[in-house]
């Protein structure tokens, strides 16, 4: 493909009809290296800062706070506003050449040695540049440049030969502003979600007794009695109904989102004839394998649990939703983490089942269960909103660049 060949994106803002130029990066700017000649003694102190590899890797726009101290000399290249950073190496070709644009004017800032920099010499809207370089059409080009077997690398000279779409600056500004606003909205939802999850963890700490105590730190009004000590087998039954149904959905350990008690994908079509433990709606699925922050699910459907799961059902002396949150409490997790085995450590049923847990009256169980259920519903709502926004962004990145 020749430089300057015209193209049209699939989706555009109104009033823009001109074709987009395809231009080589190397004809619009120059590259520079990151820190060189440094030893580990140079890092962690000094008056200069450097942009970390993870800062570049994790976002199309660099975070000015993700920098660390370093001692520098006059040979090093300071970064400037509008510079682009590229990662040069990764374990997979999909993650090579991840880009990030620096939008700060602070001095004495440098780039880490595992990335290279690019300084544009033509006018670019920085946000257009940031999201264009992360668009699927450009990411595919980077993957094709990746070379290696156990670790993949790219040549900055090859990157400079890459053709990228360059519309008029006014259209760039429109696109850049659009994606910046969308990213800001996503960030806002991520922060809200993180705060809700922190809130839940705080309440799990305070609404359940700790370290053998019979009284929680925080209680609902009207409850003052000591909690009774009950073994787990007194509040849940362990289900052992095996099934190899090829009609019911199958749940595996990796399907559960870490620490959230929900599935990370739709498993309705994941049907096969493998044998597992049959579970019903509102049973509790508890994975025995580490990590234990990713091992519980309270399904609202019937299915088959494959592999290392315990399936619990609440007994008639307790409230199902209370059991669900009891299993997330600190005391239960300590017992579950008392594992046996080395290669694949597992919780020990004899240990878990015989351990005493503090249990309140049924009325207090209802209050606690309802409270956490409402909090979980709010978390799920924000999670879904966030996922929809992320899918929306993914779709626009696919259609708005060529």
Give short role names for the model-derived ranges:
Residues 52-53, 64, 69-134, 264, ...:
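A short beta-sheet element
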Residues 26-39, 54-84, 235-240, 248-281:
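Sequence-specific dsDNA recognition surfaces
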Residues 1-2, 10-15, 37, 70, ...:
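Short, recurring structural edge motifs at helix starts
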Residues 1-17, 191-225, 384-402:
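Short amphipathic coiled-coil heptad-repeat segments
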Residues 23, 106, 110, 214:
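Short, charge-patterned binding micro-sites
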Residues 5, 36-39, 109-114, 146-171, ...:
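A short glycine-rich beta-alpha junction/loop motif
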Residues 173-185, 189-192, 228-230, 284, ...:
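Extracellular/lumenal glycan-associated surfaces
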Residues 12-35, 219-242:
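Non-catalytic DNA-recognition/assembly elements of restriction-modification systems
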